[in-house]
Amino acid sequence: MNAIEKPGLHIRSYLPHFDANCLLQHIVLSARKGVDLIHPELAQIIENGIRHYDRNRYCLLAWCIMPDHLHIYVVFLPTQLMGRNVLEWKSWITRTWQIVSGTKLLIFNPDYYDRYLRTLDQASKAIGYIEYNPVVAGYVVDPKDWRWSSAWHKARGWEAGNDWRPLFLPSGSR
């Protein structure tokens, strides 16, 4: 069993990762130099990839695709591990883009950043941080105007699942 298949603290390459069931995780994937993640076809592939297993393997709470990085805010369900899912996202997105574009371009840098959030207050702030990323960068005035984000989808009826709350909250605080 390798590091992406078991829970706990993993130190690979540059960044340590803490993977355990039912944690609120803010994950950032960075693009390789020269890759524009908001190219419309690529951004759609990315969005399809991260939304595909929503409410099956994880509860997707927020995301934002920026030109050179991708924010994903998620709670993995009890049988799922972050490392395995991140690897699958990156592999599927890259393979699909290579087929569509006819290139052998690698999309993401090898490692990723993750931070697990410990409180509902941190969770709320993380969603705001992720969805306001394009506003802070000067791309749009309102988060709901950034096409490649959960804020845009929320303005059009998408709702993050609440299935994660029983997994995260200690008994007695539900």
Report the location of each language-model feature.
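Short catalytic/metal-binding and nucleic-acid-binding patches
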Residues: 1-174
